[in-house]
A protein has these predicted regions:
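Bulky hydrophobic segments
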Residues: 1-98, 102, 106-119
Length: 119
């Protein structure tokens, strides 16, 4: 269910939150400032969304044989959804968003691997 909601939000032409909060789908609410490392930018909104999504997935599948499939799926989803922004009206592909998506998955997977190591 969470996966379906994420896909709807990502593929919606414009910002659903902007539409409801500001009555303008062209405005994207910003949770915190994006993370900047010299010339390297990571979208904070995308990072938080994929941390949330990855955490839900890991919690749901951590004791099953599907965990490796889930991790690969999350990485693939984080890339494909951002690439689709090239084809959706009022959306655009941005490397900072892609890096935020991927880093959200990476953070949760690293924490999961550390936890598994010390169980």
């Amino acid at each position: 269910f969470t996966n379906l909601i994420l896909i709807i939000f990502y593929l919606f032409p414009g910002s659903i939150f902007g539409y409801f909060l500001y009555d303008n789908s062209y405005i994207q609410p910003q949770i915190t400032k994006d993370f900047s490392f010299s010339d390297f930018l990571i979208s904070s909104n995308h990072l938080y969304v994929f941390i949330f999504l990855s955490t839900i997935g890991i919690l749901a599948y951590h004791n099953t044989s599907k965990i490796n499939f889930l991790i690969n799926y999350l990485f693939l989803l984080s890339i494909i959804l951002e690439l689709f922004h090239n084809f959706i009206p009022n959306r655009g592909f941005e490397f900072s968003d892609l890096f935020g998506n991927i880093m959200g998955v990476v953070v949760v997977v690293i924490l999961y691997k550390i936890k598994k190591k010390y169980e």
